Design a protein with these regions (language model features):
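Catalytic activation segment of kinase domains across protein kinase-like and atypical kinase folds
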Residues: 274-298
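ATP/Mg2+ or Mg2+-diphosphate-binding catalytic cores
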Residues: 341, 357-403
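Amphipathic alpha-helical interaction surfaces in cytosolic regulatory modules
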Residues: 18-94
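Conserved N-terminal boundary motif of the eukaryotic protein kinase catalytic domain
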Residues: 102-110
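Short beta-strand/loop segment at the start of cytosolic alpha/beta domains
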Residues: 1-14
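An alpha-helical support segment within catalytic cores of ATP-dependent transferases
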Residues: 165, 216-267, 271, 277, ...
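Active-site activation/catalytic loop segments of kinase-like enzymes and analogous catalytic loops
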Residues: 298-338, 354-371
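ATP-binding pocket architecture of kinase catalytic cores
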Residues: 109-222, 259
Length: 403
């Protein structure tokens, strides 16, 4: 059976059962009649979720559609049909997406929280990152693309081997996307520090080295990695609903003072979204990666590890005192070898830049509780408005931080 739907100029053709000699003639006629009625077609998608079998006559229908429509894809392909498409080479000449497995994380241990979702341990070999509600497939693909680019540039980044749908634990929730990673005996950096507090110094050095490794990588032009400053500006614009124009202007003033740069930045490097595997640090959350000046990256991490607003241990995974001590040791290692006065100046610069992230993170969701929003407004007055003369003076020194 073949059904055809369209929304505007976007067409979805759904196949069910068998697409073979007995059914393909009727299916092809139906498709042709419906498509001829349309003035223009922007995209054409074939949904194969219920397609059980495809023969050469069915393949000819797909090939004909692919030749006539530039934006063409076949989605939700079941294993037995995908095998046919792969064997015949169709997966190389058109976009073909497998049907996603559906998994539940009920009963799975929560091991990490990042800017875009939560990480659970599925079993001894694999973990799953579950994206927050509202994340689109386009967002998921973007993160996979950024992860691959960061990996190619030299970052220790885990690459997902499967996209799945995560079944909600109750009826009020929607299905979410998840990424599966194979990480043997891996745990979060936060959990590792709680289990091995005596290794805080060693971990702080590795954390600092991870930052330095990233910040030595220059992002080439023309890739998919976006400008971190432009992304930050968009987030500030997104929170205008919560803050008056004067407050927005203060945040933009800090942002506009940050020097230009093309270094690779993670922008959410904190202890609950970095994994430890065989003593090495591994990144799995690349949803905010961008390029720019390291000052912005370190400011983001300071806002999490030192000046986080809200429940610190729930978000970061360790007590605030341990997290701040860890950060202080790590930043000393990051600046190791620089004159003491330079280090002191850069620490002040990082603290000032963190004042942006302390509030721009509200752009990550449209459903934060009113109590959280009010706490942020109160803290803005304390951390930014009342100190703005001092902040402006520190901003004048940003240009001293040359790359």
């Amino acid at each position: 059976m073949t059904t055809i739907q369209h929304s505007g100029n976007d067409v979805i053709i759904s196949f069910a059962g068998h697409l073979d000699t007995a059914t393909s003639v009727e299916a092809n006629l139906k498709i042709s009649r419906e498509l001829e009625k349309m003035v223009s077609i922007d995209s054409l998608t074939c949904d194969a979720m219920k397609l059980e079998y495809i023969s050469s006559s069915g393949l000819r229908i797909l090939l004909s559609l692919a030749k006539r429509h530039k934006d063409f894809r076949v989605i939700n392909v079941q294993p037995q049909v995908y095998e046919v498409l792969e064997t015949t080479g169709f997966t190389k000449i058109m976009t073909v997406e497998r049907a996603m497995r559906r998994l539940s994380v009920e009963g799975c241990k929560l091991i990490g929280i990042g800017s875009v979702g939560k990480v659970y341990r599925l079993d001894g070999d694999t973990i799953i990152k579950v994206f927050r509600e509202g994340t689109t497939m386009e967002n998921v693909r973007r993160e996979i693309t950024l992860s691959k680019e960061a990996f190619v540039l030299g970052m220790p980044t885990a690459i997902s081997f499967d996209i799945v749908k995560v079944v909600p634990s109750n009826q009020d929730e929607e299905e979410r996307y998840g990424l599966i990673y194979e990480l043997l005996k891996a745990t979060t950096l936060g959990a590792y520090l709680k289990q091995h507090p005596e290794q805080i110094d060693e971990c702080a050095r590795k954390y600092a080295d991870l930052f330095k490794q990233m910040h030595e990588i220059e992002v080439p032009e023309g890739g998919n990695i976006p400008s971190a400053v432009q992304h930050e500006r968009q987030q500030i614009e997104h929170i205008r609903r919560y803050f008056p124009e004067e407050s927005i202007s203060m945040m933009l003033c800090i942002l506009d003072s940050i020097p230009a740069g093309n270094q690779l930045l993670h922008l959410d490097l904190q202890t609950k979204n970095v994994m430890v595997q065989d003593g090495q640090l591994m990144l799995i959350d690349m949803g905010e990666v961008g390029y720019g000046h390291p000052l912005l990256d370190l400011g983001h991490s300071y806002s999490s590890m030192v000046s986080l607003i809200g429940d610190y241990e729930k978000t970061i995974g360790i007590p605030r005192e341990l997290g701040q001590r860890f950060w202080n040791q790590a930043i000393e290692y990051y600046f190791e070898g620089l004159p003491a006065e330079t280090i002191e100046e850069r620490k002040k610069q990082i603290e000032v830049v963190s004042c942006i992230r302390n509030f721009s993170w509200l752009a990550l969701s449209d459903s934060f509780p009113e109590t959280v929003i009010e706490e942020c407004k109160t803290m803005f007055d304390e951390r930014v408005a009342q100190r703005f003369d001092y902040i402006k003076e520190v901003c004048k020194t940003f240009s001293n931080w040359t790359l």
